[in-house]
Swiss-Prot record:
UniProt function note: Activates the CHA1 gene for L-serine dehydratase. Binds to the DNA sequence 5'-GVGGARAYRTRATTCCRC-3'.
Compositional bias of kind Low complexity: 11-22
PROSITE patterns per the UniProt record, alphabetical: ZN2_CY6_FUNGAL_1, ZN2_CY6_FUNGAL_2
Gene: CHA4
Origin species: Saccharomyces cerevisiae (strain ATCC 204508 / S288c)
Region (Disordered): 1-37, 140-177
The protein's name in its UniProt record: Activatory protein CHA4
Pfam families (UniProt xref): Fungal_trans, Zn_clus
Keywords: Activator, DNA-binding, Metal-binding, Nucleus, Phosphoprotein, Transcription, Transcription regulation, Zinc
Compositionally biased region (Pro residues): 1-10
Annotated compartments: Nucleus
SUPFAM superfamilies registered for this protein in UniProt: Zn2/Cys6 DNA-binding domain
Organism domain of life: Eukaryota
InterPro entries hit by this protein: Transcr_Regulatory_Elem (IPR051615), Transcription_factor_dom_fun (IPR007219), Zn2-C6_fun-type_DNA-bd_sf (IPR036864), Zn2Cys6_DnaBD (IPR001138)
Amino acid sequence: MMLEPSPPPLTTTVTPSLPSSLKKSVTDNDQNNNNVPRKRKLACQNCRRRRRKCNMEKPCSNCIKFRTECVFTQQDLRNKRYSTTYVEALQSQIRSLKEQLQILSSSSSTIASNALSSLKNNSDHGDAPNEKILKYGETAQSALPSSESNDENESDAFTKKMPSESPPPVGTNSIYPSNSLSIIKKKTDGSTRYQQQQVSLKNLSRSPLILRSLSLFFKWLYPGHYLFIHRETFLSAFFGDTNTKSYYCSEELVFAIAALGSLISYKSETELFQQSEVFYQRAKTIVLKKIFQLEDSSLAESSSSSKLAIIQTLLCLAFYDIGSGENPMAWYLSGLAFRIAHEIGLHLNPEAWSNVYEDELSIMDFEVRSRIYWGCYIADHLIAILFGRSTSLRLSNSTVPETDELPEIETGIEEYIYDPKVILSTANPLKKLIVLSRITEIFASKIFSPNETLLQRSEYLAKFNLEVYNWRRDLPPELQWTKRSLMEMTDFNPTIAYVWFHYYIVLISYNKPFIYEIKQSRELVEGYVDELYYLLKVWKNKFKTFEKATIYMIYSAILAIQCMKSNLIKKDRKQDFLNFLSAPTLNYELARKFIENSEDALHNSETMDLLGTLSHGNDFALEYNFDFTLLNEIDMLIGGNTNDGLSK
């Protein structure tokens, strides 16, 4: 395969080809001088290494004396000097090849194959067929020009042949780059807007209500399903740390987090509790004006980095809506967040990010972006399970590596940590949740496909339950739990328990539709309901009230009650879950709406469904109940009778 580079579709780097005048082979000179006897000018390798005088015979006297192999160098390259232009050309070629290999290594096999084919085709049909091209496996020495080719005329010719500027890249199958769909326009001076943002953040950092709200959020709700936020970089940017990129915090993100934090405050803190909806509306107004450029066109001129806070804001607002029972709005906002994440290439390998973000990225920046993306991935899969819908972010098109533990701020943020004495680990639970989400992603279409028989679906469900059982068994010691450990537990740790609630929501959601037909599903759900009861009991014994409860806890209780309503699951715990959802200290509207909806359902069969227009929550069969009529017609138009022949 020829490796003389012409610009492949994946790179913008163009390497000028070397002119044939500078690629004159050394072997041609050797052939022309075969008939001219010449005396060896270099001593053998042993004499040169030992600095002995060589008699130039083969073998020489020294090699005979010391019984070593006598090897002479065939070429004397001491006087060969290559022009600076030629050396720079070779260096340019090497850089180009390295860039291509890096891009290919982070691309799919199809893209890599196409790129390599392009390289081969461009080499086979080059514009200089008589040139000596450096081939794969050939030494660089054999392709270097002889000293006679380094004259001034050839250097001039080479300089003239080099393009003055790189031509535009071919790009991907789209006319737009992978990092953004924006058409680049001349940017205006953003210094004034930046200064205004910093003044606004400075004022917010002095607000007692904002500070109290942020403290409640990070102490009680973080990390949970908010893994797309990295606490340390957010707080550093919020408090004006010059060593942290300012775009990790924005006005709308502060208000969105404050809305979630103030929502779990005590109702006796009247001013703070009432600000929750105000903060929510403020964040929503700012972010939607930016996205849809309503009175604010800054997003069109902003960098991809500044959109990170927009993604985080949208997801915070989505979870606020989920807690309020406003599921359609939550679906819209989260969908926007995942679209923007793809638009800026957040799902790509860091090797590709160097062409996405305008500013200089440090290793810490790479790690934070990885954390944000995988947090989005978990949020997407959780929302999909809650609503019984398919996911937007999939592992198959996510090339960004898994996140690792990030450094914490040693002092100064004690008010924003649940237990300042304990080091919070988020990377390990996140990695485990990624694996669990991947398992659900694989089995969803198989378990809930109406094209499979009940026997086939039950077999897939059994395999799914086994995979998730193995997942739970293989958890690290700090995350492991059992029914017995829950019964004996006295200390509830929300920074760990969210992993357990996520597990229960996944398992109950996947087994709930089959409790009528499959005995194993009934037994599993019954066991999970018992474990949930003990987990909620530990919470109540420690904290007494439920102001600081999470969406995880509410949805787990709702799923448990729905299963017990089937009359196939023991109802011993039903009243306990109902008492939890109707507790006056529980601040989420979702719980109140569920209780009211359940009571109205006893008297009115036409009552409004809890989930609004997303009325079939947790009904994956709706999502995978495909009508293949149109698809079959299209297949017939495309393939005619070919498919019939293949199927036979």
